[in-house]
Amino acid sequence: MADYEKIIRACVEPLMENPSSLLVRREETDEEAEKARDLHFLIACPDAELGRLIGRHGTVADAIRTIVNVKGRDDRKRVHIRFESFEEENEKEEDKK
């Protein structure tokens, strides 16, 4: 199976002013979703960079998803990518506690 995190980073890092602030993480899924061939990833970055990664009307985000899903077809996987700022990610982590 391909290293999807590496593919996502290769697509996203050139778009960022500060690539070291990028977080790409595979999200945990339940067993049924794994059997259904779905992979879920989170891309988190500073709020100032998020607009650049999503693009106007989501065109950049859609392009990133398309590129990653082309590789996913080789492995018979569907790849879902969610974009968030660090602020949104921190709020969700605090809500879980």
Predicted regions and their residues:
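RNA-contacting regions in translation and RNA-metabolism proteins
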Residues: 1-50, 60-63, 67-97
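The feature captures the beta-strand-to-loop junction immediately N-terminal to the Walker
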Residues: 54
